[in-house]
């Protein structure tokens, strides 16, 4: 395990140490353009194994900054990043497509990202649970906060742009197995694996 700070301008020492261990695969935990620096450093030092990134790297910045060095990278993602590649019967296809259309109309083509998709999904959840909570309690009270919690935990299967949620008292993660995708950088773009 090696660490780096967002403000670091080089991760050469960490990359050399990791490459010398010759693991089959490595996981980079960083976001956006910051995920490109360690990835590039590993490739530049001759690493040939698989390099995986977290969902936080599922932005165009990874490819913009990483260039050819991030070709073949694996990234976990929710469907909102690549709705065009989802099969027609995927539960999130419609909402993911709607999210991308609305987001890119305001911020420009190719600017979609995981984080904006999660904000869109938060609105979907709030639109479902707030009416329930408002029937149970007055906003601004402890009872209202409890009513929101209870409504979320009992909202049932809810399709969002990043997959399907099904919260419960025991499951605050919420996402079902229909959610996650593995993307690979191929020719400077995302491809569902």
Where do the PLM segments sit?
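Extracytosolic ligand-binding ectodomains
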Residues: 1-193
């Amino acid at each position: 395990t090696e660490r780096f700070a967002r403000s670091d301008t080089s991760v050469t020492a960490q990359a050399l140490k990791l490459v010398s261990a010759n693991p089959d695969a490595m996981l980079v935990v960083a976001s956006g353009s910051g995920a490109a620096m360690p990835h590039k450093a590993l490739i530049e030092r001759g690493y040939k194994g698989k390099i995986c990134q977290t969902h936080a790297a599922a932005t165009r910045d990874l490819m913009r900054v990483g260039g050819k060095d991030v070709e073949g990278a694996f990234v976990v993602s929710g469907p909102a990043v690549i709705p065009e590649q989802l099969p027609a019967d995927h539960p999130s296809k419609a909402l993911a497509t709607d999210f991308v259309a609305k987001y890119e109309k305001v911020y420009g083509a190719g600017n979609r990202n995981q984080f904006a998709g999660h904000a869109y999904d938060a609105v979907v959840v709030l639109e479902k649970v707030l009416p329930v909570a408002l029937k149970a309690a007055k906003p601004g009270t402890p009872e209202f906060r409890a009513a929101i919690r209870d409504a979320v935990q009992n909202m049932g299967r809810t399709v969002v742009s990043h997959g399907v949620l099904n919260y419960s008292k025991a499951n605050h993660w919420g996402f079902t197995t229909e959610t996650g995708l593995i993307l690979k950088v191929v020719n400077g773009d995302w491809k569902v694996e």
